[in-house]
Amino acid sequence: MPAYRSRTTTHGRNMAGARGLWRATGMKDSDFGKPIIAVVNSFTQFVPGHVHLKDLGQLVAREIEAAGGVAKEFNTIAVDDGIAMGHDGMLYSLPSRELIADSVEYMVNAHCADAMVCISNCDKITPGMLMASLRLNIPTVFVSGGPMEAGKVVLHGKQHALDLVDAMVAAADDKISDEDVKVIERSACPTCGSCSGMFTANSMNCLTEALGLSLPGNGSTLATHADRKRLFVEAGHLIVDLARRYYEQDDVKALPRTIASKQAFENAMALDIAMGGSTNTVLHILAAAHEGEVDFTMADIDALSRRVPCLSKVAPAKSDVHMEDVHRAGGIMSILGELDKGGLLNRDCPTVHAETLGDAIDRWDITRTTSDTVRDFYRAAPGGIPTQVAFSQEARWDELDTDRQNGVIRSVEHPFSKDGGLAVLKGNLAVDGCIVKTAGVDESILKFSGPARVFESQDASVKAILANEIKAGDVVVIRYEGPKGGPGMQEMLYPTSYLKSKGLGKACALITDGRFSGGTSGLSIGHVSPEAANGGTIGLVREGDIIDIDIPNRTISLRVGEAELAARRAEQDARGWRPTEVRKRNVTTALKAYAAFATSADRGAVRDLDAR
């Protein structure tokens, strides 16, 4: 029987000093021997997805203590990718994932916590905490802050649903007036919560449901809705039960590595492909699998992408559909339910809240449940009132969206497309693979060939796009923006948004060893591996080279002969794999430390301590 980890600091004569310090935090004699649960919060006033989390940590703590545990809260950092976008701040976003994972490990191991509740929400926070949970392998429940309500605005007599990306695109569109841009800006992000589309934050919070590490509704219940409070309350009680199951009954099904098995990762990736999740999720899923010592690779993702159809399209792929609409259609459990009906899911994986994922789907899928409580839960609607307060409204939809032929969630028999929402491409330009969000690609450009327009940085590409130097048919190549070359693997939301604003969203391609925001749409191919800084072929592309992209056949090729590529490689080896232009970029010691150990995207951009 495993001993409670916390006994290291709470039992024995030699721990008198430690107990004295615990007492100074409020613990009493009766608390020693109870499971000590870390409440890992990520409250910050910098990030709208986290502004409402301040009191939620203590809400969970109270429920933990009511259930017989001892709760101790601490905070991690949280970077807002939208605010950090378009300047050197974006260099810090992906590295913050590792910093978050490390800080959770430091706090939990230093104080010998027995289990943890992870209160996350936005882009790198959920992945960082997920990596930590699999690294530590102690009982863990995830509960996120929830999605933002979609913005609503009336322009020229017509109502539009909005999100952050709409504001960025409008600002770069010369045809939209300053006044309309101001209206869109003020309406795009009306409430607290993670940005309202199927961007990275919401994608990752949805995937925790498929992995079995969070409660049903975690990915889709609005941050503002009173129903979301139940998730926090239940998480507090559930984590104490999981801790007791493991430490007192030796039940390994309470541990993250048992729950998040290879089969669970296959479920999560199947969901990601079916819902057209952010391409960033591929990075994070690979990194989490690495931490859990799960043999899950790009090859597994490629295999899944060839057989899992696209069952849902949400902004940015479908601009008028947001997370509130996914929830009304039954949320993640209903997408999983459709995958289950199609034989595309592993039903037997355990979860933190049900014996198996199959049991959970049978109860929580609105098309098969017999529970009025479950159906009412998914009727939770946006309140339509700007606020930064959690659980502040109780609006309900009159009806659920159960239309599986034409609704927000489709059946396997009536998919948006038979090919899934994400695809892995390979070829001489990306020997180890690259990723495209096919759910956001217009059917007319699934096969595309064009001349390369080569840029050594995101900034240089943006200047060219805004100066109207990019023409229909071009392939924009942005390199030396990978994990090592950036460093930090910046998101390319501004280049893709500006292409869209220039009317080139369906007329150009963009290829990079960097990555894309979950808000990106169009023929945007990222994570090219190996990256340029690691000797990848993308570093050999020259202005005017023809690049061929074939999504149906999963290929991406540089139309240059092997002899010429060999000559270019020898030349590049001699000069070093670095940008040909000097970049005005402040690469600090912290970023240099990250770059020293960063791997390319096909490995999840994890650190390789044997790399030096």
From Swiss-Prot:
Write out the residues that bind [2Fe-2S] cluster.
Answer: 122, 195
Which UniProt keywords are present, listed alphabetically? 2Fe-2S, Amino-acid biosynthesis, Branched-chain amino acid biosynthesis, Iron, Iron-sulfur, Lyase, Magnesium, Metal-binding
Q: Which GO terms describe its biological process?
A: isoleucine biosynthetic process; L-valine biosynthetic process
- EC number(s): the record gives 4.2.1.9
List, separated by semicolons, the cofactors it needs: [2Fe-2S] cluster; Mg(2+)
- Enumerate the catalysed reactions: (2R)-2,3-dihydroxy-3-methylbutanoate = 3-methyl-2-oxobutanoate + H2O; (2R,3R)-2,3-dihydroxy-3-methylpentanoate = (S)-3-methyl-2-oxopentanoate + H2O
Superkingdom: Bacteria
Task: Give the modified residues of type N6-carboxylysine.
Answer: 124
- Listed pathway(s): Amino-acid biosynthesis; L-isoleucine biosynthesis; L-isoleucine from 2-oxobutanoate: step 3/4; Amino-acid biosynthesis; L-valine biosynthesis; L-valine from pyruvate: step 3/4
Per UniProt, what is one GO molecular function of this protein?
Answer: dihydroxy-acid dehydratase activity
Q: Name one Pfam family in it.
A: ILVD_EDD_N
For this record, an example GO cellular component is: cytosol
Q: What class of enzyme is it?
A: lyase
- Cofactor annotation comment: Binds 1 [2Fe-2S] cluster per subunit. This cluster acts as a Lewis acid cofactor.
Question: Which amino acids does the record list as binding Mg(2+)?
Answer: 81, 123-124, 491
Where do the catalytic residues lie?
517 (proton acceptor)
The family assignment reads: Belongs to the IlvD/Edd family.
Q: What does this protein do?
A: Functions in the biosynthesis of branched-chain amino acids. Catalyzes the dehydration of (2R,3R)-2,3-dihydroxy-3-methylpentanoate (2,3-dihydroxy-3-methylvalerate) into 2-oxo-3-methylpentanoate (2-oxo-3-methylvalerate) and of (2R)-2,3-dihydroxy-3-methylbutanoate (2,3-dihydroxyisovalerate) into 2-oxo-3-methylbutanoate (2-oxoisovalerate), the penultimate precursor to L-isoleucine and L-valine, respectively.
Q: Spell out the subunit comment.
A: Homodimer.
Protein's UniProt name: Dihydroxy-acid dehydratase
Native organism: Rhizobium etli (strain ATCC 51251 / DSM 11541 / JCM 21823 / NBRC 15573 / CFN 42)
